[in-house]
Design a protein with these regions (language model features):
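N-terminal Rossmann NAD(P)H-binding glycine-rich loop of SDR-like oxidoreductase domains
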Residues: 66-69, 73-94
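Non-catalytic terminal and boundary segments that flank Rossmann-like NAD(P)-dependent oxidoreductase
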Residues: 1-73, 405-464
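Mid/C-terminal beta-alpha module of Rossmann-like enzyme folds, strongest
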Residues: 280-375
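NAD(P)-dependent short-chain dehydrogenase/reductase
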Residues: 202-283, 297-311
Length: 464
């Protein structure tokens, strides 16, 4: 069966660039039907592969949360977005005094309320004065920061917009939290992509940079900062919506490649995570929360075949390759193989050593690994001054690189040894048809952090 898979995949790769040719199109159709038949035999297309994900719920200790929120003013940035609006509609169920939404989108498709406690301020988090005035006027007690530019592909072609929104906009929010004496906690929505040890993809880099900003202010400021790491959000999934629409209206459905898997969660889980952070934030430490039980990842090709089968249209699937923002290869050393039964894509090995689990065993709590205040402050200063698309990406990535180097100097060296062993042993590289250089700058950075130590002797043979 595996050989048959590979033969079909290989042929689809060969034919995909020629999809406009009638003969190639017809053969792609036949190959797609063959794949659907194979997946059907395995019982993989009988229902939406994400059905169980949509139905999942997390524990939410409402009495304890209400004790925290009672009589408070909550400010939600991006409160007219998918997660933000759902959060607002959940907050009204608690005994809060007022909910302020700060959002630039005057034409949102999401609805909030109606509820007399909700007030909307239209403004952009990139505008420091708007942020300052909003905080000064409403004096929030709790800030939920969900506003962001969230499209990884868009981020690669709109670098300044993404960096100024995600990084400098977050900096505006954090600074406003510090100078507004009423603020007790600030909760930030991050991404599982920030668990990467290092990344050169713009969207993921901005979120990882932000996590370090919150870690910095948790140590220097007076406010408690917490975070959630979201994975693929089904309720506003760019991938899922594109596959569905193309299956209904286009003459083919494109997927990046076979063997590309995504973990996912729903907006109810997302909001429950953010509310749970209220109970797990600590002074001096930026904790993050993730869903513990994410289930097995779903293949994007499987989703495409499911939608084609569902529409009963005679159209093929094609492989389009990985676009910008989705090109980095998954590194096996990202996950903690000391306990294979507890693997989770949203937390890396260093962070996993600090993990705790809530009483209901459905949420993992950990914290980011600090780099050092001066390193982060220097990276922020450079990013605040830079202009231009190319220059902004260079400063973003170089700043993040220095932050990561600082982190590698502080972490347990044996953990770095374990990471390199789990990720770079030849038997694992052979399975992935990969080499160490495929994983980018993080590999030489890790080796460099071990040089001159006894730990280096344990891994030097892995350098190839």
């Amino acid at each position: 069966m595996e050989t048959k898979y590979n033969e079909i995949h290989k042929r689809i790769w060969e034919l995909s660039p020629r999809i406009k040719c009638p003969e190639a199109y017809e053969e792609l159709n036949l190959l797609t039907k063959e794949l659907i038949h194979i997946y059907d035999l395995q019982g993989r297309l009988t229902e939406d592969p994400f059905n169980s994900t949509r139905a999942r719920k997390l524990s939410q200790p409402n009495e304890r949360i209400n004790d925290v929120l009672k009589g408070s003013t909550c400010l939600v940035t991006g409160g007219l977005g998918c997660v933000g609006s759902h959060l607002v509609n959940e907050l009204v169920k608690f005994d809060v005094f007022r909910i302020i939404i700060l959002d630039k989108n005057k034409n949102s498709s999401y609805t909030v309320g109606p509820d007399p406690s909700i007030e909307i301020v239209y403004g952009d988090i990139r505008d420091a004065q708007v942020v300052h005035d909003t905080f000064t006027k409403y004096k929030p007690d709790f800030v939920f920061h969900t506003a962001a530019q969230r499209d990884p592909g868009y981020a690669e072609t709109h670098i300044v917009e993404t960096v100024t929104t995600n990084v400098l906009g977050t900096l505006n929010i954090v600074k406003a939290c510090e100078y507004t004496g009423s603020v007790k906690q600030c909760i930030f929505s991050s991404t599982g992509k920030a668990s990467r040890y290092f990344t050169e993809e713009v969207y993921a880099a901005t979120k990882k940079f932000c996590e370090n900003i919150l870690d910095l202010y948790s140590k220097l400021g007076r406010v408690k900062y917490g975070m959630v790491r979201f994975t693929h959000m089904l309720d506003n999934s760019l991938m899922n919506e594109q596959l569905r629409i193309h299956s209904e209206f286009e003459n083919h459905v494109g997927v990046h490649s076979p063997g590309k898997y995504v973990t996912a969660q729903n907006k109810n889980e997302a909001v429950s995570l953010m509310l749970n952070v209220l109970l797990y934030s600590e002074v001096g430490q930026a904790n993050f929360l993730i869903v513990k039980n994410l289930e097995w990842p779903v293949e994007s090709l499987e989703m495409a075949l499911y939608y084609i089968k569902k529409t009963r249209r005679n159209i093929p699937v094609v492989f389009i390759g990985n676009p910008l923002g989705y090109t980095e290869k998954f590194f096996r050393g990202q996950m903690d193989w000391s306990n294979p039964c507890e693997l989770n894509l949203l937390i890396n090995v260093y962070e996993n050593k600090f993990r705790k689990v809530n009483d209901d065993d459905d949420v993992v709590v950990s914290h980011v690994c600090s780099s050092g205040n001066k390193v982060v402050e220097k990276a922020i200063c450079k990013l605040e001054r830079v202009k231009g698309e190319v220059e902004t990406k260079i400063v973003l990535i170089n700043g993040l690189k220095e932050i990561v180097k600082g982190t590698l100097e502080k972490v347990n060296k044996q953990h770095t040894v374990d990471i390199l062993n789990w990720g770079l042993q030849q038997k694992f590289l052979d399975v992935e048809n990969a080499k160490a250089s495929d994983y980018g700058a993080i590999i030489p950075m890790m080796f460099g952090s071990l040089e001159g130590s006894a730990h280096y002797e344990q891994v030097k043979n892995l350098k190839g």
